[in-house]
Amino acid sequence: MTVRIAINGFGRIGRNVVRALYESGRRAEITVVAINELADAAGMAHLLKYDTSHGRFAWEVRHEREQLFVGDDVIRILHERTLADLPWRELGVDVVLDCTGVYGNREHGEAHIAAGAKKVLFSHPGSNDLDATVVFGVNQNELRAEHRIVSNASCTTNCIIPVIKLLDDAYGIESGTVTTIHSAMNDQQVIDAYHSDLRRTRAASQSIIPVDTKLAAGITRIFPQFNDRFEAIAVRVPTINVTAIDLSVTVKKPVKASEVNQLLQKAAQGAFHGIVDYTESPLVSIDFNHDPHSAIVDGTQTRVSGAHLIKTLVWCDNEWGFANRMLDTTLAMAAVGFRLDASASTKL
């Protein structure tokens, strides 16, 4: 079965989803039938072909009127502002990947379904009333056919949750703090300009900028047992891609740094292969650009204090890794089938 998807929003994540689909060789499993984006077709084609972070796309890209051609594939281009007007039923869409960053609650998901989509996957955490929030590699096996409106969480949640699970299963986490060192994003300014967040009025290329984060809430959404036991802060730094996360946890069992690294390296080679990677090479952020893993543990930075306080540094390509997980979750949603009875929905 080939899953027919539509993409709503062709920004950083939407474009990387298309690139990842073609580069990963999954076109026999997933077909993009339509992209809804308010920008014009010429701009869409150009930014798909040329990307400052990820380089030139290897596939031929062109557009004619309201059609985007990727190799021999034809993708319909839409410019609808209203979700109810999207022709998902006409196009036979199985799953909508909503990558706008604007929509993310149950009402928005139901609008896609009313327009004819069978399921919806949001590219950000979304509201608490969705059917499921999935961190692929950790809880995708809990998906059911009735889970129609799903969130793929965030790039940072996908990065840190597998590591938290591994440490908790092995040593028992008491509490933790997280600092996200995140590349600049397009909600920041090129030069000083107005923004509702006064820190984000400042030029992104000239400062390390503290911003709000809901990562702690994202952790407890996946692991409710950690409610009020994790806190998170975030800063944006003057790079355009790749993120590092500084994770500190207190654990019940005494442990050594070498044992932590052995645990994480074994997981990267085994149960979490393809999701978690492990390195002890002397690398910097640019070296993780275009890395498809959700998390890359930097074993050179693991520390243990007093046998119970663990500090780790985890890298991720916040665009490419997350785009690959969007594809993984899409296939997982399709694999459990499509149940169209809305009353049967049960929350994960």
From Swiss-Prot:
The entry sums up its family as follows: Belongs to the glyceraldehyde-3-phosphate dehydrogenase family. Epd subfamily.
Q: Which Gene3D superfamilies match?
A: Dihydrodipicolinate Reductase, domain 2, NAD(P)-binding Rossmann-like Domain
Task: Specify the species.
Answer: Salmonella dublin (strain CT_02021853)
What is said about its interaction partners and assembly?
A: Homotetramer.
Q: Which reaction does it catalyse?
A: D-erythrose 4-phosphate + NAD(+) + H2O = 4-phospho-D-erythronate + NADH + 2 H(+)
Binding-site residues for substrate, renumbered to this chain: 154-156, 200, 213-214, 236
Summarizing the function annotation, the protein's role is: Catalyzes the NAD-dependent conversion of D-erythrose 4-phosphate to 4-phosphoerythronate.
Q: Site Activates thiol group during catalysis: which residues?
A: 182
Cellular compartments per GO CC:
cytoplasm
- Under which main EC class is this enzyme filed? oxidoreductase
Which residues bind NAD(+) per the record? 12-13, 81, 318
Q: Which PROSITE patterns match?
A: GAPDH
GO terms for biological process, alphabetical: glucose metabolic process; pyridoxal phosphate biosynthetic process; pyridoxine biosynthetic process
Q: Name it.
A: D-erythrose-4-phosphate dehydrogenase
Which residues are annotated as active site? Answer: 155 (nucleophile)
**Keywords assigned by UniProt, alphabetized:** Cytoplasm, NAD, Oxidoreductase, Pyridoxine biosynthesis
Coiled coil location: none
Annotated pathway? Cofactor biosynthesis; pyridoxine 5'-phosphate biosynthesis; pyridoxine 5'-phosphate from D-erythrose 4-phosphate: step 1/5
Q: Where in the cell is it found?
A: Cytoplasm
Query: What CDD domains does the record tag this protein with?
Result: GAPDH_C_E4PDH, GAPDH_N_E4PDH
